[in-house]
Every structure is written in C-alpha cells, then in structure tokens.
Amino acid sequence: MKKKYLLIFTCILLLFCLTSCSKQETENPGETVVNFLNALQQQNYASAKAYYSENLDNLPNFKNKIEAISPSVANELFSKLADFSYTIKKVEIDSNDPNKAYVSVSLQCYDLGTAFKNTILDYLKTDLEMTFDGAKDEEIIKKAEETILTDISKSEKSFRRTVMISLAKEEGTWKLNKISENHELLNCLSGNIINTIDEMSKEINTTK
C-alpha cells in the first residue's frame, strides 16, 4: 500500500502526457484557447478534447487511479490543479502560414511544486519515524494520506508565468498543438510540479 502512495508522486508526470481529437468549430485561435482552459478549469476533459489535437484521456484515467487510492487526495489535488486563473495577452496569426497561430497567456496557478517537494520529504520522514516506532502499515498509510492532504491544502496560488500557446488550423478548426512539447505551459498546468521534479532530479544527480 505504501508503494501506492509513492505512485501518487511519481505518476504525476503522466498527468500531462496528452496524446486523438474531436471536432468543434471555433472562430479564432484566442477563442479556442479560452474554451480549452475553461474546460480544464471545470475538469470537463471531454469538452477540452474538442480544442486539442492530441489525446486527453490520460487525465481522467490518472484521476481515477488516484481516487482508487485516496478519494480525498484526488479531490484536493485536482481541485487545486483546476483552480487557475488566466488572461489572454495577445493573439497572433503566423504571417508566413495562416494555418498557424500563437496565443500569449498569463497564468496564475497554485504552487503545487513546493507542496510536492514538501510531501516527498514529509512522507519519507514520517514513514521512517513510524517504522522505527513499530507502527503498523495501516497507521503509516493513514498518516501519509494526512501529510499529503496537508501539504496540498497549504499550497498558495502564487505561481505566475506568461506562456506562448501554439495552434494549428485543421479542416477549418483551430486546435492547440501537443502540450507535452510546450514545457512552460505543461509546467504551469501542473502547478510547477514539472520544474520541481526536474530540479530535484538535478540535485540528486549532483550529489552522486
């Protein structure tokens, strides 16, 4: 069971591995981005698929996996991920290709990266302490869940970035290009978790 909780941390990277498509007419690339981000805020992934050129099925599938382990952790995590605000700054059609566009978006998200790092450290500390104290696995698991919930709930909506979103017109419909290739947007939508994982990996490799 403890491995399942560690899975929550390590599998978050899969959250935004987005790879299929659905058709819905939109007038301009700015409107497409607005509709896509609004759908993510509402956790309406079926609607979001209409504005995205790849597959979003990994998002609800991942959420279901987390819910199977801990409904309370899944609810808190996905509520924070969805609770971002944004402002469209600029919409630009590629002067060399009218089927390509770029939308600049200012995003404000919960800093879940800090929560993620704290959760890893707090979980390992709690696990070791309770193990040496002779605690049962059930007790350690319960405490781990409490630790995760506390760290996520304490996160603040303080992460701000302006990112460029690229789109392409497919059969007269504007759609976002593959987000997994847009590191800055991916990191924002993850609440800075992606960059935090990268930084932690570098720290670990440096100490080897």
Model-derived features: positions:
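Short, aromatic-enriched amphipathic alpha-helices that serve as compact interaction elements
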Residues: 27-44, 51
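C-terminal motif of bacterial Sec signal peptides marking the signal peptidase cleavage site
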Residues: 17-20
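Bacterial signal peptide processing site
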Residues: 22-24
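Hydrophobic beta-strand residues in large extracellular and virion-surface proteins
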Residues: 33, 86-91, 103-105, 165-167, ...
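Sec-dependent N-terminal signal peptides
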Residues: 6-13
